[in-house]
Amino acid sequence: MAVNHFRFAIASDLHIALPHTVWEHPSRFHLVEYSIEAFEVVLAHLCTLELDFLLIPGDLTQHGEPENHQWLAHRLAQLPFPAYVIPGNHDLPTPAHFAPFLQFYRDYGYGWNQQPYYSLHPLPGIRLIGLNSNFFTPTGEQIGYLDQAQMDWLSQELPKSKDLTLVMIHHNLIEHMPGQGSNPLGQRYMLENRTPVCELLHQAGVQLLFTGHLHVQDIAYSDRFQMYEITTGSTVSFPHPYRLLEYRDRTLSITSHRVEQIPSLANLSEFSRTWMGDRAHAFIAKLLMAPPLGLSREETNVLLPDLRYFWADLAAGDAQFNFVHFPEPARSFLEAFSDRPPADNQVILDLS
């Protein structure tokens, strides 16, 4: 008999890094040195709840280090509920990393599959499809793309069941900010062949996508494909979020939580927001100078001081920006990043 009520959690972009593997770089954005402590805080909370499963939508490790995969696989084995994972771009830095990845996570979705995607039923009447969005071009460039073999598999798999289907994929399929699919800075977070993938999912009645990669708390809806994409921020960058979700009678209730302190850093939230603000200026400058805004360096430098926490506020979700003192067109461009419905952190989605 199909389950009509279940609870699950999402923790994304863990970037697990054991101390001896931490990559030191002066402009490093991710607080990977706190990855294990932050994840342990998440798990301590989740283990007090009656969850049916946990989803981790990619970037499980810092840079695909075997010892970091081993640590995570061992830790997931200790949980009182199943966990299901997919690879992110950081987990598969080269094509040679695919086979070991499947070995590490056989118990977390892949079983004895020879391919990095799967379909399973975590509960009666609930289907979970885990996809691999990492693709290497002939020149070795890593992009977000579903290859033809996976597209063929997906087109055959989707019609096999009319069960409620959850799809987990690392790259975004629906835009979470203005022009994400066309802006050079936003494109790399999106699946290149997202339109045919969305068409396949829509034809099968899929309404729920769970993604990561962007390190932003956002829920986007596509009118064209009648589909929600729930992307969850990273546990190693502000605001260190994770989500609890409860499905009941064709509604999905979503609540979001934050890791605000860890044993080694009582003021993690404040420290992390400052860390991000100190390192965001180069990214924000590129955003302002790139098309479609195309500001000059001089114009950009005037605006940057007031945009120190722009990305942190965006990452937190539900942001509402007001730059009334900015000249046009910069004001309209930046205010367009204000959140649009549905809400990003606490919301009930109607799936009827």
Identify the role of each PLM range.
Residues 12-37, 93-111, 137-146, 181-186, ...:
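Acidic/histidine-rich helix-loop elements
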Residues 1-70:
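N-terminal active-site segment of His-dependent metallophosphoesterases
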Residues 66, 70-155, 159, 188, ...:
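Extended active-site neighborhood of metal-dependent phosphoesterases/phosphodiesterases
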Residues 17-20, 62-67, 89-96, 136-139, ...:
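Active-site environment of divalent metal-dependent phosphoester hydrolases
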Residues 13, 54, 59, 72, ...:
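Divalent metal-coordination and catalytic microenvironments
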Residues 226-302, 335-352:
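Binuclear metal-dependent phosphoesterase catalytic core
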Residues 44-53, 127, 141-228, 290-291, ...:
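His/acidic metal-ligating clusters that form di-metal
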Residues 1-9, 119-130, 160-164, 222-229, ...:
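Beta-strand-turn-beta hairpins that frame and shape the catalytic cleft
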